[in-house]
């Protein structure tokens, strides 16, 4: 985090010398983006785009990214960090679902204490943890999401936490969260 302070000092000096310095404004926007100050970043990128200079194409792409992040409004530090990734892994998605959506709270609210008979396989599925989650940085979240069957991994089978999530897996995970929380099996 020290580089933020150093970069900020240099960029402020450059902008003090020349208020509309395109490169300094662009890199200030990047610095704010990586500091998770997305609205500030958006403002800097917009300024560069409006200047229509050499950096306007780059700034436009970064401006679009910062706008998407601002609209998504990640509420946790993890959500803000993951928002900057081009692609996310299965572990990243497990963390997002657990932290941003607070899946355990949703699941507890949607499942009443006497919610009916469970077969032995359902009981085992609720308590099984993936064989490759142990020792992983996202172990707690992976186990939480696996316990509810949101991201598929057969009991005792690998979760593949570092594999990039594809659209189908993402859609199925969201569909499971929605169907479990709304009670709609369809």
Model-derived segments and their meaning:
Residues 2-9, 16-186:
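N-terminal propeptides
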């Amino acid at each position: 985090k020290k580089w933020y302070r150093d970069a900020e000092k240099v960029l402020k000096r450059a902008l003090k010398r020349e208020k509309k310095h395109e490169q300094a404004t662009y890199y200030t926007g990047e610095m704010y983006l990586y500091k998770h100050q997305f609205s500030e970043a958006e403002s800097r990128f917009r300024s560069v785009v409006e200047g229509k200079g050499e950096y306007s194409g780059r700034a436009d792409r970064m401006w679009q990214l910062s706008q998407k992040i601002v609209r998504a409004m990640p509420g946790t530090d993890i959500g803000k960090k993951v928002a900057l990734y081009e692609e996310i892994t299965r572990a990243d998605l497990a963390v997002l679902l657990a932290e941003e959506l607070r899946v355990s709270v949703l699941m507890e609210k949607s499942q009443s204490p006497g919610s009916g008979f469970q077969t032995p396989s359902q009981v085992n599925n609720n308590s099984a943890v993936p064989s490759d989650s142990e020792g992983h940085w996202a172990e707690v979240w992976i186990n939480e999401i696996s316990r509810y069957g949101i991201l598929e991994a057969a009991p005792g089978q690998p979760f593949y936490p570092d594999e990039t999530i594809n659209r189908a897996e993402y859609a199925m995970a969201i569909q499971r969260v929605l169907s479990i929380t709304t009670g709609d099996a369809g």
